[in-house]
Amino acid sequence: MPLELTQSRVQKIWVPVDHRPSLPRSCGPKLTNSPTVIVMVGLPARGKTYISKKLTRYLNWIGVPTKVFNVGEYRREAVKQYSSYNFFRPDNEEAMRVRKQCALAALRDVKSYLTKEGGQIAVFDATNTTRERRHMILHFAKENDFKAFFIESVCDDPTVVASNIMEVKISSPDYKDCNSAEAMDDFMKRINCYEASYQPLDPDKCDRDLSFIKVIDVGRRFLVNRVQDHIQSRIVYYLMNIHVQPRTIYLCRHGENEYNVQGKIGGDSGLSSRGKKFANALSKFVEEQNLKDLRVWTSQLKSTIQTAEALRLPYEQWKALNEIDAGVCEELTYEEIRDTYPEEYALREQDKYYYRYPTGESYQDLVQRLEPVIMELERQENVLVICHQAVLRCLLAYFLDKSAEEMPYLKCPLHTVLKLTPVAYGCRVESIYLNVESVSTHRERSEAVKIQHFASVVRPSSYTELDFLSVESAKQDAKKGPNPLMRRNSVTPLASPEPTKKPRINSFEEHVASTSAALPSCLPPEVPTQLPGQPLLGKACLRTVCHIFSKFSPY
């Protein structure tokens, strides 16, 4: 008699963490891509404004529209004359009312920025030390369908706090008529006023359902709680890579190479005689700086490697530091590009940041490729980066907080070292020319681009309504994003896998001729290689090629 299979009943065992049920991860705004309000939390002189400005610079650089709203500036606008720390006493009811009104005014501007001005992230930079204030901000975010992400900076090291006060606070407008000792004393008393009512974020009880990161002792430790989305995870990743230790970053281009002399773009040519002189001059410059544990980074192209070889120091090659891929325009001069690819030339002049070379890259692509380099630069101390013009522009735009519109036109001359020293809320730049002559590869922004002339050469029927594009309209287009005329090359990866040589095909006739030559015995007799009376173009060419390969494909 066959045995009957039986299955025991599954029992569920519930182990509650506490008496209050946890909120689901999906609670909050209904839209996945809702704008985000980043809420700073912490006592004064804990680096909140430093984090706000640095994070905003990074987010804008990667293409996420972000703006800081500093409540202290609203307070200084409302109260023209700062008297003393008494303004921040918790028992000063009139001052408390003014401070709350300033916070509400800042939140109104946050709402306007995120709903009307195209912003994606607003950084609400204030102390926000009480739960009452944070609940008010949470209610504001929920009411407007915004996500809220808190960043709390905690630091109990008196040396760090005193350093922050001396470097930043005593030079603020509040203390313009005070000496350093008076300013330090008043600010310490201001901190004491906040400490009396400070309620830190509590991940175990009161604030367990909030999304936040707690930065402890200037990045020594981190506590992350309930990250909601991709952008918040990128913010966490960025904050975990930055540090405040003194260091110097040196940026320079390779020495002049043979293609620079010939006016060609891209390629992988070696140094010219003047380029080799620069490499030797750079070696002497580095020795004079007497830097401890200097790291040297180069691209994988000859010119940067040959420049680094002269330093007689260990160096690392980064593929991410390779020059922008010019696709079919590699190893051409700008005059040759204008004559061979007139439409591409016009489109690039029209919008240099978003324009992508056919089978190549755009500046926007390059920024995405360089993000890991930026993360590693933020982690390092003294570094020398030897790279290329477009790459240097992208790196410089990050450190100097330049917009996407300005980035492709930053001047980065050959044989010049840019010395970057991080300061309180930015970066100090020194340009050091090493006294070796070179050609100039900088091209100024065009005042106007005559699209109709160039486009009519290729597609006369498509652009009959276009006139001159002025600089002002180009600026507006850059703010809005990629131009609608842009050919996006969606089949091309953002970063080309290797800087390999690509065969250039100037016309469909050349393509068909090469295809016919490659397959002389494979063409079916019923398929013509050229339509009667005209060259094989467009869909006709596509149908022909598809027909050929469908007939002779083994699959």
From Swiss-Prot:
What is the name of the protein in this document?
Answer: 6-phosphofructo-2-kinase/fructose-2,6-bisphosphatase 3
Q: How is it modified after translation?
A: Phosphorylation by AMPK stimulates activity.
Residues at site: Transition state stabilizer? 253, 260, 388
Name the residues that bind beta-D-fructose 2,6-bisphosphate.
Answer: 253, 260, 266, 334, 348, 352, 363, 389, 393
GO terms under biological process: apoptotic process; fructose 2,6-bisphosphate metabolic process; fructose metabolic process; glial cell differentiation; glycolytic process; motor behavior; regulation of glycolytic process
Question: Which Cys-Cys disulphide bridges does the record give?
Answer: none
GO cellular component term, pick one:
nucleoplasm
Give any GO molecular function from the UniProt entry: fructose-2,6-bisphosphate 2-phosphatase activity
